[in-house]
Amino acid sequence: MNPRRKSRLKVVVLIMFSVAVAAGLTLYALSQNIDLFYTPSEIVKGKNNDPQLKPAVGQRIRVGGMVVEGSVKRDDKTLKVEFNLNDIGPAITVEYEGILPDLFREGQGIVAQGVLVEPTRLKASEVLAKHDENYMPPELGDKMKQQHNAVGVAEGDLKGESIRDKAELDRTFNTLQGESK
């Protein structure tokens, strides 16, 4: 092989090696910022009720659900707050130190991001509250529909409008129309 070809080959190999190292470092950096989304039921039972698919203790995750009524405990001396979060199944405990969003309250849907410190305990670094009574993050809505359908809850019940509620509204509406004639 002549010297010119050798030098070109060295340059090509060096460039390919540099690109491979850069790609590897980029993928490593991105993997550190990926937070998988779970519902409280999936944390306790695993995704699709498979215990093999539970998040590991120490893993960074995002979890979405509803704040359980009566579960919020605030520390009088610090900004530490502890509350339970559930969907339709079991609840997990979330601990957070910081200022909660204005829309945070019991019975409210939230998404918490943090590290799983015990199998059912999340140390949150960020808590996000939904913006109005109808908003739900798409991923949380999809997961809750899957959980509810598996348990036998009707689609209308997820929206707070069961068939019984709609029938009651129809009767009230018809009664009011009859009185106005």
Curated annotation (Swiss-Prot):
<keyword id="KW-0201">Cytochrome c-type biogenesis</keyword>
<dbReference type="InterPro" id="IPR012340">
    <property type="entry name" value="NA-bd_OB-fold"/>
</dbReference>
<feature type="topological domain" description="Cytoplasmic">
    <location>
        <begin position="1"/>
        <end position="8"/>
    </location>
</feature>
<dbReference type="GO" id="GO:0017004">
    <property type="term" value="P:cytochrome complex assembly"/>
</dbReference>
<keyword id="KW-1003">Cell membrane</keyword>
<keyword id="KW-0735">Signal-anchor</keyword>
<comment type="function">
    <text>Heme chaperone required for the biogenesis of c-type cytochromes. Transiently binds heme delivered by CcmC and transfers the heme to apo-cytochromes in a process facilitated by CcmF and CcmH.</text>
</comment>
<dbReference type="InterPro" id="IPR036127">
    <property type="entry name" value="CcmE-like_sf"/>
</dbReference>
<keyword id="KW-0479">Metal-binding</keyword>
<dbReference type="InterPro" id="IPR004329">
    <property type="entry name" value="CcmE"/>
</dbReference>
<dbReference type="GO" id="GO:0020037">
    <property type="term" value="F:heme binding"/>
</dbReference>
<keyword id="KW-1133">Transmembrane helix</keyword>
<dbReference type="GO" id="GO:0005886">
    <property type="term" value="C:plasma membrane"/>
</dbReference>
<feature type="topological domain" description="Periplasmic">
    <location>
        <begin position="30"/>
        <end position="181"/>
    </location>
</feature>
<keyword id="KW-0812">Transmembrane</keyword>
<keyword id="KW-0349">Heme</keyword>
<keyword id="KW-0472">Membrane</keyword>
<keyword id="KW-0997">Cell inner membrane</keyword>
<dbReference type="Pfam" id="PF03100">
    <property type="entry name" value="CcmE"/>
</dbReference>
<dbReference type="GO" id="GO:0046872">
    <property type="term" value="F:metal ion binding"/>
</dbReference>
<comment type="similarity">
    <text>Belongs to the CcmE/CycJ family.</text>
</comment>
<feature type="binding site" description="covalent">
    <location>
        <position position="131"/>
    </location>
    <ligand>
        <name>heme</name>
    </ligand>
</feature>
<protein>
    <recommendedName>
        <fullName>Cytochrome c-type biogenesis protein CcmE</fullName>
    </recommendedName>
</protein>
<feature type="binding site" description="axial binding residue">
    <location>
        <position position="135"/>
    </location>
    <ligand>
        <name>heme</name>
    </ligand>
</feature>
<feature type="transmembrane region" description="Helical; Signal-anchor for type II membrane protein">
    <location>
        <begin position="9"/>
        <end position="29"/>
    </location>
</feature>
<keyword id="KW-0408">Iron</keyword>
